[in-house]
């Protein structure tokens, strides 16, 4: 599902700005029942991104209240979100990342309009919600059946004519694999889970990245697909098993050879930005705990990473800013990203 906010332009305008294609065959993935899509937003190229990770606490009681049709929409909860958005503006960040299950579905229009106005990207988990057989969200749960866990990827863009008008693109990703504990609660209350076997690869400011929601990250098959393509990988979580996911995210940064942004509930912690370097410098930022909701900020240097990746091993081992790329890492894809031609290659056949 995708939505464009503040946009009254023609469909031709949208086609020039937002391009989407099924790239499953181009990734040469063995048939695993998943569909892989590339979504490209035509925005000005950036050599680095300033990332803000939200250190916020998720409350299990809010999840239970959803299942009991008694959702928490207290004003204090909205004020917490508002404070984070003000911090994002104050710190002049490019992308704000929040954990799984954080924002109520009804508040997404607030985020998309904020994103468009301030040209700040937002990736956040959407609080569980329940639909009936027609896919509607009713007031009563008499006819309800499925519980949804969505990730919202909100990417802003301008009209391409001097930035006179600002817009934002919203993509809602349905979680592909629910955690066992999550399923236990959902089925225990008499519902079934809604899932969809689709994984997206985004291109925004010529930065390429997939987004994973917590338990999805445990799939070796899906997290390995984007090697050479991903400049960064985003993982939003609500996860108690911090050590297991810590091992995954550290290995992933080296195996895929990209920056990894992991955001978890602050009471479990290990929210961080990881880079493919030696262990001493691996974490650009890392945090756990705290009673106040805050944003931690760090920049990732996309140009520096690509310039390193395009070198052969003999030069990489002498340049110690990163660890060497793994075997079969495709440097031709890196060159295409540097030249900003990768999206044309991935999408051209679909559009022809």
Which role fits each region the language model picked out?
Residues 13-44, 138-228, 247-248:
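Active-site catalytic loop in hydrolytic enzyme cores
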Residues 72-76, 98-102, 186-191, 209-216, ...:
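Short, flexible loop segments at the rims of nucleotide/cofactor-binding pockets, characterized by
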Residues 1-95, 102-103:
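N-terminal, active-site-proximal structural segment of metallo-dependent hydrolase catalytic domains
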Residues 90-96, 203-207, 228-233:
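Short, surface-exposed connector motifs at secondary-structure boundaries
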Residues 73-171, 239-241, 254-256:
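Cys-nucleophile CN-hydrolase/nitrilase-fold catalytic domain and related Cys-dependent amidase chemistry
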Residues 106-127, 135, 144, 208, ...:
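CN hydrolase (nitrilase-like) catalytic-core segments centered on the catalytic cysteine
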Residues 12-22, 201-215, 312-352:
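Cysteine/selenocysteine-centered motifs that mediate thiol-based redox chemistry or coordinate metal-sulfur cofactors
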Residues 48-70, 172-174, 207-216, 234-236:
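Active-site-proximal beta-strand elements of phosphoester/diester hydrolases
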């Amino acid at each position: 599902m995708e939505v464009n906010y503040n946009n009254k332009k023609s469909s031709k305008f949208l086609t020039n700005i937002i391009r989407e294609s099924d790239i499953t065959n181009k990734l040469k993935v063995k048939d695993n029942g998943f569909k892989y899509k590339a979504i490209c937003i035509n925005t000005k190229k950036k050599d680095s991104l300033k990332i803000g990770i939200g250190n916020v606490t998720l409350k299990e009681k809010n999840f239970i209240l959803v299942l009991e049709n008694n959702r928490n929409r207290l004003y204090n909860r909205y004020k917490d979100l508002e404070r984070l958005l003000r911090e994002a503006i104050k710190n002049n960040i490019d992308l704000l990342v929040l954990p799984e299950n954080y924002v109520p579905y009804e508040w997404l229009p607030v985020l998309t309009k904020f994103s468009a106005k301030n040209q700040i990207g937002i990736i956040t988990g959407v609080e569980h919600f329940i639909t009936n057989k027609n896919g509607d969200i009713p007031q009563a749960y008499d006819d309800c059946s499925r519980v949804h866990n969505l990730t919202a990827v909100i990417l802003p863009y301008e009209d391409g004519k001097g930035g006179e008008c600002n817009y934002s693109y919203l993509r809602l990703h349905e979680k592909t694999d629910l955690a066992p504990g999550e399923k236990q609660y959902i089925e225990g209350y008499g519902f079934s889970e809604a899932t969809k076997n689709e994984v997206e690869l985004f291109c925004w400011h010529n930065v390429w990245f997939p987004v994973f929601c917590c338990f999805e990250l445990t799939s070796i098959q899906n997290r390995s697909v984007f090697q050479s393509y991903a400049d960064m990988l985003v993982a939003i979580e609500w996860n108690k098993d911090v050590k297991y996911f810590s091992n995954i995210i550290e290995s992933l940064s080296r195996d895929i050879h990209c920056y990894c942004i992991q955001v978890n509930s602050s009471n479990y912690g290990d929210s961080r930005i990881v880079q493919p370097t030696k262990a001493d410098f691996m974490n650009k930022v890392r945090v756990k705990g705290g009673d106040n909701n805050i944003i931690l900020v760090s920049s990732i240097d996309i140009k520096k990473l690509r310039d390193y990746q395009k070198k052969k091993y003999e030069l990489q081992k002498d340049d110690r800013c990163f660890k060497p790329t793994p075997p079969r890492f495709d440097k031709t894809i890196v060159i295409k990203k540097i030249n900003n031609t990768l999206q044309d290659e991935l999408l051209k056949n679909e559009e022809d």
